[in-house]
């Protein structure tokens, strides 16, 4: 029986699906209430005025207006606010 024995299978060959994180609306862009501004893991960006924070730390607009990024506080934290137009 001149048959080749089955070779071992590779232990690589899998990867997790990308989670599409990141900034969805940039500074100066107009948004409507409920629009997602940032999808993130943890609080890389913090919620400022008129911005809500979901349980997965997603930041979203609570009012219509323009997106404003700012760095403030003693720890130089990045805040995102919505400024009414």
From Swiss-Prot:
Its GO biological process annotations read: translation
Keywords of this entry = Ribonucleoprotein, Ribosomal protein
Span list, region Disordered? 1-22
An MF annotation (GO) of this entry? structural constituent of ribosome
The cross-references to Gene3D superfamilies, in alphabetical order and at most eight, read: 2.40.50.100
GO cellular component terms? cytosolic large ribosomal subunit
Pfam families in the record: Ribosomal_L27
Protein origin, superkingdom: Bacteria
- Assigned protein family: Belongs to the bacterial ribosomal protein bL27 family.
Q: What PANTHER family does UniProt report for this protein, alphabetically? A: LARGE RIBOSOMAL SUBUNIT PROTEIN BL27M (PTHR15893:SF0), RIBOSOMAL PROTEIN L27 (PTHR15893)
Q: What is this protein called?
A: Large ribosomal subunit protein bL27
Q: Report the gene name.
A: rpmA
């Amino acid at each position: 029986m001149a048959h080749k024995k089955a070779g071992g299978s590779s232990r690589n060959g899998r990867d997790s699906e990308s989670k599409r994180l990141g900034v969805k609306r940039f500074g100066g862009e107009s948004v409507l209430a409920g629009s997602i501004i940032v999808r993130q893991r943890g609080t890389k960006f913090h919620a400022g005025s008129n911005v809500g924070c979901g349980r997965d730390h997603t930041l979203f607009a609570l009012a219509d207006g323009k997106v404003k990024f700012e760095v403030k506080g003693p720890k130089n934290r990045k805040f995102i606010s919505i400024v009414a137009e």
